[in-house]
Every structure is written in C-alpha cells, then in structure tokens.
Amino acid sequence: MLTDRQLLILQAIVDDYIRSAEPVGSRSISKREDITFSPATIRNEMADLEELGFLEKPHSSAGRIPSQKGYRYYVDHLLMPHRLTKKERHYIHELFTKRIQEVEQAIQQSAQILSSMTRYISVVLGPEMFETKLKSIHMIPLTAHSVVVIFVTDTGYVENQTMHLPHSVNPVDLEKTVNILNERLAGVSLFQLREKLNKEVADVLRFHVTNYELVLDLLEKTFEAEKSEKVFYGGKTNLLSQPEFRDVEKIKQILTILEQDDVMHQMIRSSGEQIQVRIGHENNVEAFEDLSVITASYSIGGKHMGTIGIVGPTRMEYRRTISVVEHLSKDLTKLLTDLYQQS
C-alpha cells in the first residue's frame, strides 16, 4: 500500500515524464505547486518507489522514469477523468457527418480521426462476422467476363468482390443464380453461407443453371473471402515522431506486426464494452513491449460489432487518449446504428 506522499510523487513523475520524455529528478518535482516536500524527502521516496518496482532508473541519468508497473498503477488508480473540449467534440462530429453512407466508410473515417487526434497509430476492426447475416446479394457486370458481387448485411455493411467468369458462364445463368441466392440465403449468417451453399443451394442450381458446378466453385471462393474481418489503420508512421522510437530496428519490428492483420486482430479485439488498457508486456507480443494499447468496442443496433484501438508508447498521454477513444466509440456506435436503421 502506497502512502499519500508516494502517490503524489508517483503521479507527478508519470505526468512529467509523459510530457517531457526525460527522466524526472527530485529537484524538478519539488518545484511543482502541488508538491510541498523537500528534494531530499522526494529522493528518499523515489528510492522507495524504485525498490517497490514502480520506478526505474536509466543508467545515464540521476532521474527516474515510470516502470510498466508504475504505469499500470497510474492508469488504474491515479488517472483523473478528462473531458474533450467543445472544439474537439465538434471536430469529430463534423467529420462523421460528411455524407457517410456506408458502414465501411464510417469505420475508415474513425481510424483517420483517431490517429489525427492522438498522434498515435489507430487500429479499427471491421464488423465481426460471427453473427452478421446476409441481407441481399447483387451482381453487376463489369465486362463480358467479370462481375462485381455486392454483399449487403443486416447491419448495413456493404462489401464488394470482383468475380471473374469463364466463357462458359452466361448472363442468364447469373441472373438465375442471384435470384436463387437471395431466396435461399437471405438471413443466413456469413459463417454459414458456404455450408448452406453446398447443402441447399447446390441442389437448386443443379436444375436451373448450366455449368452449375463451375458457378458453385466461384461462389464458394467469394463467400470464403467475405468471412474475413477487415482491419483498418491510421497514422502508421506516427511513432517515428516519438523520441523513444528512434531505433530503426525497433520500428521495423513494430511495422512488421502491424502488417499482420491476424495478429493485430487478436491483440485489438475487445469482448466487453469498457475501455481496456494493455501496457507493454501485457500485449503478449515482443515487438510491443514498449507500447500501450487502448481499446473500446462499438455496436450496431445494440449488438457488439467491432473494436477501435490506439497503439502508442507506454509513455502515452493516457487521460486524453482514453477520452478520445471513449468518445469516438460512442459516436461511431450512434452513426452506424443510424445507418442500420435507414437500411
């Protein structure tokens, strides 16, 4: 259990280090208006906090920096609520009301807003497909041998897939196929599409569509691609402006992980409605040992759909960043729910 004096000093050190990125000494702490202790007293308390694992001492400095244990305590017990300014709230609202008509467009926009407001990396997971159901399928010819397959889900999500057609598939067969798919697959979960396609739709196609096996194979591949949940990014190079990431090899390792959507999906995905903060080693990814990840979920029509997140240094401006993520998750939920109700 930390004393009140230790709590004040720990909070002062974390706040100063977040602001300056420089180790914090007892003299600079003693100059703060909210600290009334002498430099000698502060030094003793800093030594105790270091011994307890809340602070670390860089080799080349007399000052201290927060450890990951220190950041965790700071986030869990010392963080005061932060309210976005009216200007910041207006900025988010304005960007979200600029003719956004599709779910994916709204999600892409939220990634850009997050990265521009925080100066960190934003990661937004597209709607989870486990419970998402197909509403309708459309096919629009592009050329004599290719069409765009448009999927519309019950949440208003619209996805396009280009399908290349062999010469043996004719327009009449395509029209029949679309009618059969909409009749048989509307309301089916995206994760059950392939199963339904092979068990129920195949028998119907066999009687109505020439070269039905070829059409079936093309549809299977298209449906399989549709099951994947997309990951959207913003500000991937923002970490380059942070002083602790001047090591080229460290940046390379981080960017390599950011290119692996499956890894990022597992790391960012949130199952709860509350803000989640993972610090350093809590991310369970070696390249993210010096990074913190803040996430919140968003919903559509009251149903949990995806996650928005921020990746930044452990020396992150937690108060403001948490507030931005929280505010944006609520605004995105409202926007997507409105789009869902209009669809």
From Swiss-Prot:
Biological process (GO) annotations held by this record are: negative regulation of DNA-templated transcription
Task: Give a Pfam family name.
Answer: HrcA
Per UniProt, which keywords does this protein have? Answer: Repressor, Stress response, Transcription, Transcription regulation
Q: Which InterPro entries match?
A: GAF-like_dom_sf, HrcA, HrcA_C, WH-like_DNA-bd_sf, WH_DNA-bd_sf, WHTH_HrcA_DNA-bd, WHTH_transcript_rep_HrcA_IDD
Keyword Transcription regulation attached: yes
**GO molecular function terms attached to this record:** DNA binding
* PANTHER family recorded: HEAT-INDUCIBLE TRANSCRIPTION REPRESSOR HRCA
Q: Which family does it belong to?
A: Belongs to the HrcA family.
The protein's job, in short, is: Negative regulator of class I heat shock genes (grpE-dnaK-dnaJ and groELS operons). Prevents heat-shock induction of these operons.
For this entry, the protein name equals: Heat-inducible transcription repressor HrcA
Species this protein is from: Halalkalibacterium halodurans (strain ATCC BAA-125 / DSM 18197 / FERM 7344 / JCM 9153 / C-125) (Bacillus halodurans)
